[in-house]
Amino acid sequence: MLNNRASGVLLHISSLPSKYGIGCFDECAYAFVDFLKEAGQHYWQILPLCPTTVGDSPYQSISTFALNEYFIDLDALCRLGYLKKEEYEDIKWFEYEDEVDYSLLYTNRHRVLYKAFDRFKRNIPNDFNSFCEQNSYWLDDYALFCAVKDYFGGEPFYYWNEDIKYREELAIEEYINICNERILYYKMLQYFAFSQWLGLKKYAFDNGISIIGDMPIYVAGDSADVWANREIFKLDSNLEASD
């Protein structure tokens, strides 16, 4: 890949133009690929695509495997019949058009995406189960983590009830049942995000543009990665990061 001299541009997905609060995998992303090709560029460098939470930094994510649901193209969901235009066009997405308002984005994106979920669960796509199976090594823990986090009002996992905090087997089964629909919702978000991201990557590759990614080398202390793999992290007795 790097044997020949070539140039490119660093532009994170979030910095692409958008009417809906933040840059995403929409027509502007495809137009940027066209721009790079016309400008004689060969590389598009991006930052980590993982979900952001407190601090809104991709270097402090709740998962190093998942994609950020903010990057889902709402227009694409509309074309597929999961959304209606009026369900997301008339929403206030930001205070200033040149700035991302993460508070508004969090509230409004999930409100809109849950409307898509209401339609999705009535007619689940044929390839959804295979997506979940192929990514089960991280997706199951991630979706459960997000769902249980919602159940506890967004509290860090080390403040949850002791049984689920320490991932006791019976507690895992109990919360899978309690949060079943919410788990499916978070899996759906990843299904949409990965489908759109892979489509954009293929378009870039077909047009001679290679994407240089960035590794999310720091995980948040309150993350699915730490919760599901606490034996490989330096934690105190309460499962918080140890000095």
Regions found by a protein language model. Give the residues of each.
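Acidic/aromatic-lined carbohydrate-recognition and catalytic surfaces
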Residues: 2-230
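Metal-dependent catalytic core segments for phosphate chemistry
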Residues: 223-243
